[in-house]
C-alpha cells in the first residue's frame, strides 16, 4: 500500500499538473488503443482531485486542466492533418493544439464545478 499513499500525495500536492496528466492518460482509452482500464484510473484520479479540492474555484481549475489534457491530446488528428502542407499550415499547429484544448476544456470544467457543489459530507 506504500505506492498508493505516494500516488495520493502526488495527486494532492500538484492538482493541476495531475489533472492535466490524467486527461492525457484518458486518451489511451480512445481508438486505436482501447486501453479502457486507463480510463477508469483517469476518472478515479479526477474524482479524488475533485473531492479533495478545497473550493469551487479549485475544482473548476482541476476540471479545466483535465479537459485541456484530454482534448488537446485526443484531437491530435487535427494537427496531423495540418502537417500535410507543413510550409503553408505549420504555423496553425500550436494554435490548434492550445485552442482546442483551451476551448473544449471548459466542457469538463463546468461539470467538475457542479460535482464540487453536490459532493457529500
Where are these regions (language model features)?
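Membrane-embedded alpha-helical bundles of multi-pass enzymes
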Residues: 2-121
Amino acid at each position: 500500500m506504500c505506492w498508493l499513499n505516494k500516488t495520493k500525495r502526488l495527486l494532492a500536492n500538484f492538482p493541476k499538473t495531475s489533472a492535466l496528466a490524467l486527461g492525457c492518460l484518458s486518451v489511451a482509452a480512445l481508438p486505436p488503443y482501447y486501453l479502457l482500464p486507463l480510463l477508469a484510473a483517469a476518472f478515479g484520479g479526477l474524482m479524488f482531485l475533485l473531492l479533495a479540492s478545497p473550493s469551487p474555484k479549485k475544482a473548476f481549475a482541476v476540471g479545466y486542466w483535465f479537459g485541456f489534457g484530454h482534448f488537446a491530446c485526443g484531437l491530435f488528428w487535427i494537427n496531423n492533418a495540418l502537417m500535410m502542407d507543413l510550409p503553408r499550415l505549420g504555423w496553425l499547429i500550436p494554435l490548434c493544439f492550445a485552442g482546442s484544448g483551451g476551448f473544449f476544456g471548459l466542457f469538463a470544467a463546468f461539470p467538475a464545478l457542479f460535482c464540487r457543489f453536490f459532493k457529500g459530507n
